A protein has these predicted regions:
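Glycine-rich FAD pyrophosphate-binding loop
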Residues: 23-44
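A short, surface-exposed helix-loop junction/capping segment
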Residues: 32-36, 143-152
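Terminal, non-catalytic protein-protein interaction segments that mediate quaternary/complex assembly
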Residues: 13, 26, 34, 58-63, ...
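N-terminal Rossmann-like FAD-binding beta1-loop-alpha1 element of flavoenzymes
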Residues: 4-29
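Predominantly flavin-linked oxidoreductase catalytic cores and closely associated redox partners
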Residues: 148-250
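Short, solvent-exposed loop/turn segments at secondary-structure junctions
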Residues: 13-14, 38-39, 49, 183-185, ...
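Dinucleotide-binding Rossmann-like beta1-alpha1 core, especially the glycine-rich loop
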Residues: 44-136
Length: 250
């Protein structure tokens, strides 16, 4: 079946990121999006990893375009305070280490120095051995060098709600944007959604994408696809299902 038109259900960050990707990469496909005016958007001040830069590269999206408008900041690594010992920290580094003789130089440098001077090159110095940006972060600075590889050495802290709205307003002008509540569907002979209903309005598309988050209007609600938990008590591998957010000294 040739996909000629797509309906995205849900207008949060995931919905508008999906719409942006379709507009950019599949301009021959007619993209539509329907969202509820009454359903709040999930957003807790998202923290990303460096892999998000691959997505931005697909969209030809530059930091100068969106960061200021969305209240975003750069993120250079993840620090675990009191992680393995009270008063000690461990940093999870971002970026690509320098390659020497087909080996990641940052890793090898740290292990060699750790053996030679274990009292100085402790575990909390690992990130700074991987990449120069660790040194900058400890000095509370970030380079202004135009050639610095921000595309893989950094990630972002962002207001996800504002980011989704920015994509909507700046990258999705071609999207047919609607408001409404999905109330039902008609399925085809294979059990797939053929037609959606938004109250009394009929919506028929070649492909439907569920971006409704935890509510899962299409997958769980209409298709009855069971939610698969990663919690260890339910056969998964996730030991922790709770997070406490707080400000650390910085």
């Amino acid at each position: 079946m040739q996909i000629r038109n797509v309906l995205i259900v849900g207008g949060g960050t995931a919905g508008w990121m999906t719409a942006t990707a379709l507009v950019k990469l599949c301009p021959h496909i007619k993209t539509s999006l329907i969202e509820s005016k009454d359903q709040p958007i999930i957003g807790v001040g998202e923290s990303t990893l460096g892999q998000i830069n691959d997505f931005f590269a697909l969209l030809d999206l530059t930091d100068e375009e969106w960061m200021k408008e969305t209240g975003s900041t750069y993120k250079s690594n993840i620090r675990f305070t009191d992680f393995y010992k009270k008063g000690e920290t461990w940093d999870y580094p971002f970026g690509k280490s320098t390659i020497v003789n087909d080996l990641p130089h940052g890793w090898m440098s740290w292990f060699a120095l750790n053996i030679e001077k274990p009292e100085k090159f402790t575990r909390d110095t690992f990130a700074r051995s991987m990449n120069i940006i660790g040194h900058l972060a400890y000095a509370n600075k970030l380079t202004r060098c135009d050639k610095f590889p921000f595309d893989h050495d950094t990630a972002y802290h962002m207001d996800a709600v504002k980011f989704g709205q920015w994509l909507r307003d700046n990258r999705c002008q071609e999207v047919d944007h609607m408001y409404g509540e999905i109330t039902g569907c008609v399925k085809d002979e294979h059990g797939n959604i053929d037609v959606l209903y938004a109250r009394n309005k009929e919506l028929k598309y070649d492909l439907y994408i569920d971006c409704t988050g935890f509510i899962s209007v299409l997958l769980e609600g209409l298709m009855k696809v069971p939610f698969k938990s990663f919690h260890v008590n339910e056969g998964g591998c996730l030991l922790n299902d709770t997070a406490v957010t707080c400000h650390m000294p910085h």
